[in-house]
């Protein structure tokens, strides 16, 4: 079986993390199956290093474009792929082979107002619904996301399989002291700070986090800093207004995107990680923080309670006061912090990319088992009555 994987989003934080860790673990587990990785030209050298059975194939079709609807199926046909794995919801209808699709969440269906225009909304809706119906198997990353898919798409629930994400191994490793010193000095992190990592799109609820942070200051922790990693302040007018409204310019810092090695150190330095998102298919940052031994405050909605279990303080993300209460509870009680660290480390160990990759391989095998095998050549009798295969093959007596 030759398996194709769409790796064009390798650069992305969320789906890119999924692709990077999946192919890395597949390379460790499987040295026999041929894998064809459709990728951007700049990603091909790194993917070539996975192993002899992993072959990157450059594909320049734009993501979420009309061109990919034609060019992806053509590439799969040209490369003689027998099973295609789409690691996000785009599964072109002309795909010439069996297929598996990973639908991480239904955010574009839950929050259509976040899309830039009506064309983008129609494209997202039709792509998700078509992928869920046409794929031989649908993978998703939480029971919460599975429920959401079934809410919006009329498809067989038995073909939807939940396979959890996991944190990257680097978040479980103690950073070198010199790296800690370097990060602390470069970003001037001498004071106690609360950390948020992610973008500032509306559903991430960063504006309400700023409101909650102001309440924390008003309750006496007025020395505390809030460090936001992942987006520049200029990306969100609402967040910028919230910082201005509460006069928190000296206490809220936006550091933009940071390399994962730097992020791993940031988690270790933070007194608390807070993630008040309104919706997540999985919610990777809280798990990364727990793997780093950092106490977590996160939302009590969507997949976040499923991922965090009892290893985080859960709050109502629609209530700035409740978010502030969660922050205060952790930062003012050493016993709570110690308990969250212990539970968080244990919880993070329950998620493994190796386990996830093994389950994905099982799904590939299930789909492969349903493929029609090559039919043997028909057998006819010659003039003397001896059977021989059509096409010039020899009889057993020749």
What are these model-derived regions, one by one?
Residues 1-386, 390, 395-398:
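Carbohydrate transferase catalytic cores enriched for Leloir-type hexosyltransferases
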């Amino acid at each position: 079986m030759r398996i194709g994987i769409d790796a064009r989003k390798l650069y992305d934080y969320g789906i890119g993390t999924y692709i990077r860790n999946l192919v890395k673990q597949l390379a460790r587990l499987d040295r026999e199956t041929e894998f064809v990785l459709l990728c951007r030209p700049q990603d091909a050298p790194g993917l070539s290093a996975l192993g002899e059975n992993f072959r990157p194939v450059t594909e320049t079709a734009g993501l979420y474009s009309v061109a990919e609807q034609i060019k992806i199926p053509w590439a799969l046909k040209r490369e003689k792929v027998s099973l295609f794995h789409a690691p996000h919801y785009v599964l072109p209808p002309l795909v010439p082979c069996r297929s598996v699709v990973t639908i991480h969440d239904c955010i574009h269906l839950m929050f259509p107002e976040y899309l830039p225009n009506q064309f983008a909304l129609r494209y997202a809706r039709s792509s998700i619904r078509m992928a869920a119906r046409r794929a031989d198997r649908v993978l998703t990353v939480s029971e919460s996301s599975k429920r959401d898919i079934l809410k919006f798409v009329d498809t067989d629930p038995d073909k939807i399989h939940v396979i959890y994400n996991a944190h990257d191994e680097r978040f479980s490793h103690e950073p070198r002291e010199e790296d800690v010193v370097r990060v602390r000095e470069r970003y001037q992190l001498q004071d106690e700070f609360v950390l948020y990592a992610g973008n500032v799109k509306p559903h991430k609820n960063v504006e309400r986090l700023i409101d909650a942070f102001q309440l924390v200051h008003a309750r006496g922790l007025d020395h505390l800093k809030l460090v936001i990693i992942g987006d520049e302040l200029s990306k969100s007018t609402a967040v910028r207004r919230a910082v201005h409204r509460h006069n928190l310019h000296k206490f809220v810092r936006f550091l933009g995107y940071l390399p994962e090695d730097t992020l791993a150190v940031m988690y270790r330095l933070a007194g608390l990680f807070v993630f008040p998102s309104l919706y997540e298919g999985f919610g990777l940052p809280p798990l990364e923080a727990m793997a780093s031994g950092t106490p977590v405050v996160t939302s009590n909605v969507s997949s976040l309670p499923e991922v965090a279990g009892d290893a985080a303080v859960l709050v109502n993300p629609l209530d700035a006061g409740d978010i502030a209460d969660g922050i205060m509870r952790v930062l003012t009680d050493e016993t709570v912090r110690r308990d969250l660290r212990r539970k968080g480390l244990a919880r993070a160990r329950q998620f493994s990319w190796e386990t996830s990759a093994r389950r994905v391989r099982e799904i590939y095998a299930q789909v492969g088992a349903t493929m029609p095998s090559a039919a043997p050549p028909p057998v006819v009798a010659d003039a003397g009555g001896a059977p021989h295969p059509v096409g010039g093959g020899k009889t057993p007596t020749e």
